[in-house]
Design a protein with these regions (language model features):
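An active-site-proximal beta-strand-loop segment
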Residues: 76-111, 117
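Active-site beta-loop-alpha junctions of metal-dependent nucleic acid enzymes
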Residues: 95, 114-137
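Basic, flexible linker segments flanking DNA-binding modules
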Residues: 1-79, 232-237
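Short small-residue beta-strand/loop micro-motif enriched in glycine and branched aliphatics
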Residues: 109-113, 169-171, 195
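RNase H-like two-metal-ion nuclease catalytic core shared by retroviral integrases
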Residues: 58-60, 146-148, 154-158, 168-190, ...
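Conserved, non-catalytic sequence blocks in retroelement Pol enzymes and Pol-derived host proteins
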Residues: 11, 30, 75-77, 92, ...
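C-terminal domain-tail junction helix/linker
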Residues: 162-166, 188-257
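Mobile genetic element proteins and their domesticated derivatives, centered on retroelements
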Residues: 1-2, 17, 21, 37, ...
Length: 257
């Protein structure tokens, strides 16, 4: 069963594998603790080894206006309260690519994305427009949070935010914790779904599209109480972790919206 699950999510962590297998264990009348499953996976060589990588894509030395961080002490309590945006590097044998992502800070659902062979603002705008088109709660007040990269400070990008009534927040320094959700989602896509080292740009786009779909609709999120981002996006009254320096306590009372 683990091998079948790994065909869809090759590097899914052990805790999430255990959670995903609970219905199967129940159907078979089996009981398997997390530590026991870890032992089985370790003996079979199925535990995932994480590797760290970092390629800087933020270019914050530019002439555009830089906005303040207005979510620093905010409590993220609902979907479409805060979106986080970031750009991550993707390697192919043809050329270097850059993946622009817009993620909901509450549900961790990837709302919009765009893959490009350059760092121009147009690519980030396409990801943003996709996210806006995918809004489930268009009447809710929304804050867009990002680093101080020139793409997000560009007047053309700001114009799209203003047109849609979206407030702007930016990091104050180059600190991963100030945009922790975006950094974490980048890591999940690379570490668990292996979205790098492709042969061609066409292959990269095809496999990244599949990976994002699997991430949104199938992958359980620890910080979402093992809900998928798609399901978490529809929850209310559930205080989720936001990958800050101090995680908030979770209120286990749920209501589906």
């Amino acid at each position: 069963m683990i091998k079948v699950l790994r065909k869809r999510m090759a590097k899914l962590g052990g805790k999430k594998v255990h959670k995903k297998l609970q219905p199967h264990f129940k159907d078979q009348g089996l009981r398997c603790s997390r530590s026991k499953l870890f032992d089985i996976m370790r003996d079979a060589g199925l535990l995932v080894k994480k590797c760290k990588r970092y390629v800087k894509t933020t270019q914050s030395y530019h002439r555009f206006y830089k906005y303040a961080n207005i979510i620093k002490d905010a409590k993220i309590e609902r979907s479409e309260q805060v979106w986080v945006s970031d750009i991550t590097y993707i390697k192919t044998k043809e050329k270097s690519l850059y993946l622009s992502l817009v993620t909901d800070a509450y549900s961790k659902q990837i709302m919009g994305w765009e893959l490009s062979d350059n760092l121009k603002t147009e690519s980030s705008i396409k990801a943003l427009k996709m996210a806006i088109g995918n809004r489930r709660y268009p009447n809710r007040s929304l804050i867009h949070h990002s680093d101080r990269g020139f793409q997000y400070c560009n007047p053309e990008y700001v114009k799209v935010l203003d047109k849609n009534g979206i407030d702007i927040s930016m990091t104050t320094r180059h600190d991963p914790y100030e945009n922790a959700v975006a950094e974490r989602v980048n890591g999940i896509l690379k570490d668990e779904f292996g979205i790098e080292n492709f042969i061609t740009q066409k292959q990269a786009k095809r496999e990244i599209k599949t990976a994002i779909g699997t991430y949104n609709y199938e992958r359980p999120h620890l910080s979402c109480g093992y809900l998928t981002p798609w399901d978490a996006h529809r929850m209310e009254g559930y205080k989720l972790k936001t990958w800050s320096r101090k995680f908030t306590e979770r209120d286990m009372s749920l209501s589906v919206n």
